[in-house]
Design a protein with these regions (language model features):
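ABC-type ATPase nucleotide-binding domains, specifically the catalytic core motifs of the NBD
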Residues: 9-29, 39-44, 48, 152-154
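ABC ATPase signature
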Residues: 10, 53-54, 67-68
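Conserved ABC ATPase signature
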Residues: 50-54, 58
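A short, proline-enriched helix->beta-strand linker immediately N-terminal to the Walker B motif
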Residues: 69-73, 79
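Helical segment within the ABC ATPase nucleotide-binding domain
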Residues: 89-102
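Short, glycine/charged-rich "phosphate-handling" switch motifs in NTP-dependent
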Residues: 122, 134
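ABC ATPase nucleotide-binding domains
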Residues: 153-177
């Protein structure tokens, strides 16, 4: 779901119905629809509006809501906070927590490491397509190297260092001390 994948020409309700298309039980579809509207009250107010006219945050909520219409056991979210205002990032974060607490497993791919690790059980730090570190999310949040990298360690010329550079620098610094 990177970006906001909605059917711009369909209404909010029509977008949600497409998410439950594999379900033939009308009562189950209605229950899923009600659950999504309860989870996203902003969408309930805009249910007859065309999705292309929704704000970025509302489109992201709609995309997540549409995925939830299928009542998944696993929800994969790719960059759900992409391009959102900080207030909306908090709302999306809270929604992800609620989805998980309701029994749906969530696989979250996110560049906002602080947000992602604050709600995750386990995390993987990737760089150029490779896992460079993994572990319990709470431990990763407290890791000095992760904090230093995500706070933006700058080299002598002011360039941003990669995680590997930070690890190499710190190992060398400790060894030479």
């Amino acid at each position: 779901m990177e970006g906001r994948r909605v059917f711009a020409e369909l209404t909010v309700d029509e977008n949600l119905v497409t998410g439950g298309i594999t379900n033939t039980d009308r009562k189950a579809i209605a229950a899923s629809h009600d659950r999504v509207m309860t989870m996203f009250p902003l969408l309930a107010d805009r249910r007859k509006d065309v999705a292309g006219y929704l704000s970025g945050g509302e489109q992201q909520m709609l995309a997540i809501g549409r995925a939830l219409m299928a009542d998944p056991k696993l929800l994969i979210l790719d960059e759900p906070s992409l391009g959102l205002a900080p207030k909306l990032v908090g709302q999306i974060r809270d929604t992800i927590v609620a989805i998980n607490e309701a029994g749906t497993s969530v696989l979250l791919i996110e560049q906002n490491a602080n947000m992602a690790l604050s709600i995750a059980d386990y995390g993987y730090i990737m760089e150029t397509g490779k896992v460079v570190m993994d572990g319990e999310a709470a431990k990763l949040l407290k890791d000095e190297d992760i904090q230093e990298f995500y706070l933006g360690l700058h080299g002598d010329e002011g360039e941003r260092k990669s995680f590997r550079d930070v690890k190499h620098y710190k190992r060398r610094k400790r060894w030479l001390s």
